[in-house]
Amino acid sequence: GFGSLFKFLAKKVAKTVAKQAAKQGAKYIANKQTE
């Protein structure tokens, strides 16, 4: 049904956002360490 599709999409988006956030965080930490 529609609910399960929405849940599936929400999970995908959450995973993508988490990946992006992890990348940004790693970059930020690396920049802080090189200062």
UniProtKB/Swiss-Prot annotation:
<comment type="similarity">
    <text>Belongs to the cationic peptide 04 (cupiennin) family. 01 subfamily.</text>
</comment>
<keyword id="KW-0044">Antibiotic</keyword>
<keyword id="KW-0354">Hemolysis</keyword>
<keyword id="KW-0964">Secreted</keyword>
<feature type="modified residue" description="Glutamic acid 1-amide">
    <location>
        <position position="35"/>
    </location>
</feature>
<dbReference type="GO" id="GO:0005576">
    <property type="term" value="C:extracellular region"/>
</dbReference>
<keyword id="KW-0800">Toxin</keyword>
<dbReference type="GO" id="GO:0042742">
    <property type="term" value="P:defense response to bacterium"/>
</dbReference>
<dbReference type="GO" id="GO:0031640">
    <property type="term" value="P:killing of cells of another organism"/>
</dbReference>
<comment type="function">
    <text>Has antimicrobial activity against E.coli, E.faecalis, P.aeruginosa, and S.aureus.</text>
</comment>
<keyword id="KW-0027">Amidation</keyword>
<dbReference type="GO" id="GO:0090729">
    <property type="term" value="F:toxin activity"/>
</dbReference>
<keyword id="KW-0929">Antimicrobial</keyword>
<dbReference type="Pfam" id="PF17563">
    <property type="entry name" value="Cu"/>
</dbReference>
<protein>
    <recommendedName>
        <fullName>Cupiennin-1c</fullName>
    </recommendedName>
</protein>
<dbReference type="InterPro" id="IPR035164">
    <property type="entry name" value="Cupiennin"/>
</dbReference>
<keyword id="KW-0204">Cytolysis</keyword>
<keyword id="KW-0528">Neurotoxin</keyword>
